[in-house]
């Protein structure tokens, strides 16, 4: 148990080191992931999470770096949102977004809340509250973003982004009738295939 604890501490130290280099532009995502994997691959390690889930080292490193960089980008976006005095944000949409068959309209089902306009404070009939819908909050005074629920927007391994939005613009993720342009069934099939591939 002590060796595992030390290995995980060593991994966290290395992740912090490469996170700094990637965030400062000194190293690319790809090279950071390769460096971490090269230094630990020979041990065949897995990372155990407090939730009970377990990931291969490659999956854990990728998740950590992608999550960290997306959260950093979100903080920069939030500054622009505050400078512009925007009340609304548009959340991006992509094929293969995470979904939960047991709770298809829940926070952890990213395909449910992606591609929609949200209000930062309060809500409108056509713009739900950002925090309530996605688990992500933006302080309207400071622009600081906070992942309230790590299963939602900018949480674990989330690839979605958000940007300031003017409701007079047309949402590029929906058709003229307001329906998502991404086929939900195809997107869920792609997600399931990606999960099967990661499990191999």
Protein language model features and the residues they cover:
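Domain-core detector
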Residues: 1-153, 165-200
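Extracellular structured ligand-interaction cores
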Residues: 157
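Catalytic core of tubulin tyrosine ligase-like
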Residues: 160
């Amino acid at each position: 148990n002590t060796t595992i604890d030390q290995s995980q501490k060593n991994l966290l130290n290395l992740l912090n080191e490469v996170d700094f280099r990637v965030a400062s532009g000194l190293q690319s995502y790809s090279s950071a992931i390769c460096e971490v994997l090269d230094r630990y691959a020979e041990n065949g390690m897995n990372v155990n999470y407090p939730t009970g889930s377990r990931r291969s080292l490659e999956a854990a490193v990728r998740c950590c770096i992608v999550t960290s960089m997306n959260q950093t980008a979100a903080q920069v976006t939030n500054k622009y949102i505050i400078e512009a005095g925007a009340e609304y944000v548009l959340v991006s949409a992509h094929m293969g977004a995470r979904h939960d068959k047991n709770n298809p309209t829940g926070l952890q089902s990213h395909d449910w809340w992606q591609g929609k306009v949200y209000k930062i404070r309060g809500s409108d009939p056509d713009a739900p509250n950002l925090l309530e819908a996605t688990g992500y909050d933006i302080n309207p005074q400071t622009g600081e973003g906070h992942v309230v629920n790590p299963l939602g927007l900018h949480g674990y391994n989330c690839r979605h982004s958000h940007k300031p939005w003017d409701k007079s613009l047309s949402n590029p993720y929906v058709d003229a009738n307001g329906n998502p342009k991404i086929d939900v069934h195809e997107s869920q099939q792609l997600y399931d295939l990606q999960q099967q591939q990661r499990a191999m």
